[in-house]
Amino acid sequence: MAEHHYDVVVIGAGPSGEGAAMNAAKHNRRVAIIEDKPTVGGNCTHWGTIPSKALRHSVKQIITFNTNQMFRDIGEPRWFSFPRVLQNAQKVIGKQVKLRTQFYSRNRVDLINGRAAFVDKHRLEIRGNKSVETIHFKQAIIATGSRPYLPPDVDFRHHRIYNSDSILNLSHTPRTLIIYGAGVIGSEYASIFAGLGVKVDLINPGSRLLSFLDDEISDALSYHLRNNGVLVRHNEQYESVKGDDHGVVLSLQSGKKIRADAFLWCNGRSGNTENLGLENVGLTPNSRGQLAVDEHYRTEVEHIYAAGDVIGWPSLASAAYDQGRAASSDITQDEYFRFVDDVPTGIYTIPEISSVGKTERELTEAKVPYDVGQAFFKDLARAQITGEAVGMLKILFHRETREILGIHCFGDQAAEIVHIGQAIMNQEGEANSLNYFINTTFNYPTMAEAYRVAALNGLNRIF
């Protein structure tokens, strides 16, 4: 049995693991990263962020072609199957894996394939296909990510019942689809399949879509999903899911029954903490498989850290990467350490959504004297040129100091547009001000110009 010694060992080669390993290596630590899959990238690259966003992009191009009058003059609408649009996603996945594998070799991080389990507080056992290795470490970072939560009373082995990972194995385009769970993943897939002409029933156990969003943005998403043919059912809980050779029947606790060609479960995720030997180091995950950490990403065992989806909120690839970097920054005593607690939300529905900061509801409950500046995309020259006129930018600011309190965007490129506002919000003191957008010259025509339009709109409300 081979034995190796490292300063830092990272378990999991997804975004948080990559961020942790790269940062530790840059600080001259001897680093190993352990991945139980054949290739790096984690759920983000293979089943989550990358394939779903590549799918969305392809579907959005199809929608643009089919709704643009200029294209209609030269041909009929075109429809593509789900497997066909998935081909582009597979190409992107391959490029991402190659790129990220090079990161490790270039930075002299040892990439070890195998399943890791703690033997004690300073040793890991790595079981590969043909060998067993022991690794001694000074510090460890658990970055094993998460997977879809699968209720035991639903038969996910049935060929018509999918979860948000296995849906990428779908070999045909269903005519009808039931999606259970109207969170971020469920809403994104509802947009994707509706764009392919699939009749979608979106079942929401809650009272409104994505309730953490600003109410106006949530309402806009509801409207556009319905406008694209998605039937949204709120306050519904499943009773049973039964599949047969001809379809799937969802029985709801309210007494309703819905039938479709396929069923997609998108309700909740669980941390990947099984078989890690956590009991050997005195760690116990919660009921969702997640590990508790302090403000330095340390678990209850001081030299063992955790980051990314395995610790829960916010379960975003962007935040996971920064959490991993932060965990290794604490190990290396990096002056740039920060606890990641203020991250923008990016939701890749069609149209997309992004926000950062407070919502109107939160500010109202806190009795903050705020006001609103709005810019509607239909009034922007760039949006008129591109034909992407659906959407808006909304700036929430303090009525007296003009401090920016929240940015909310709905429409094409929302996830890009939000970062301009985020950059100003993160400035200290008087630099965080609505005045920046009023006194700054923006390129024309651009979508960024929406900030000037919204700022002037908000300024006009002040008296």
Swiss-Prot record:
Signal sequence residues: none
UniProt KW Oxidoreductase keyword: yes
Pfam families: Pyr_redox_2 (PF07992), Pyr_redox_dim (PF02852)
EC number: 1.6.1.1
Keywords from the named record: Cytoplasm, FAD, Flavoprotein, NAD, NADP, Oxidoreductase
Catalysed transformations (reactions): NAD(+) + NADPH = NADH + NADP(+)
Keyword NADP found: yes
SUPFAM superfamilies, A to Z: FAD/NAD(P)-binding domain, FAD/NAD-linked reductases, dimerisation (C-terminal) domain
GO BP field: 2-oxoglutarate metabolic process; NADP metabolic process
Function of the molecule: Conversion of NADPH, generated by peripheral catabolic pathways, to NADH, which can enter the respiratory chain for energy generation.
Protein name: Soluble pyridine nucleotide transhydrogenase
Gene field: sthA
